[in-house]
Amino acid sequence: DWDAMIDTNVKGLLYVTRVIAPKMVAAGRGHIFNIGSIAGTEAYENGAVYCASKHAVHAISQSMRADLLSYGIKVSEVRPGMVETEFSVVRFHGDRTAADNVYRGVEPLTGDDIAEAIAWIAQLPAHMNVNEIVLMPSQQACQYYVHRKS
C-alpha cells in the first residue's frame, strides 16, 4: 500500500524527528539514526514508491545533518541491502514462497546485523560521524546482482 509506505518511511521519520530534535537541541548533543535502503539510490523494477520513499530518507538525512550540525547533533543514515524481514512477505502480498525465494541461496543480513552497525557508529569518538553507511550481505554486489549459492 503506497500510503502506508510513505506514511511509515517518510512521514514517520519526520514526525519522530520533530519530537526528538528539539530535546537534542536543548541538550546541545544527540545522534539521529535514519534507516534508509540501497533502494534509495538504486531503483528496481516495480519498486517506484518504495525506492522514492527511501530516496526521501536519504535526502532528509542530508538536510537534517546540515540543519542540526551547529547544535552538536549528528545524523547518520544506515542503508542496508538485502535484510531478511517481513518486508518481502508484504511486497509479495502474503505469498510466502515468493518472499522466501528472495533469500534463496543467500545469507541475508538480519535486524541484529543492522543494530550492531548502529551500536558501532554510536560508540565512535565525539569528533567522528558516519554520515551514511551501506551494509550488504557479502553475496550482494548491488541492488540487482546477488551471487546465489546452489
Predicted regions and their residues:
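Substrate-binding pocket helix/loop in short-chain dehydrogenase/reductase
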Residues: 1-3
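Active-site helix of classical SDR
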Residues: 17, 53
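A short helix-coil junction within the Rossmann-fold of NAD(P)-dependent oxidoreductases
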Residues: 19-28
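Alpha-helical segment proximal to the catalytic Tyr-Lys
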Residues: 22, 66-69
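Residue(s) in the substrate-gating loop at a strand-loop-helix junction
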Residues: 37
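Active-site loop immediately N-terminal to the catalytic Tyr-X3-Lys motif
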Residues: 44-48
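C-terminal helical subdomain
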Residues: 77-81, 85, 97-144
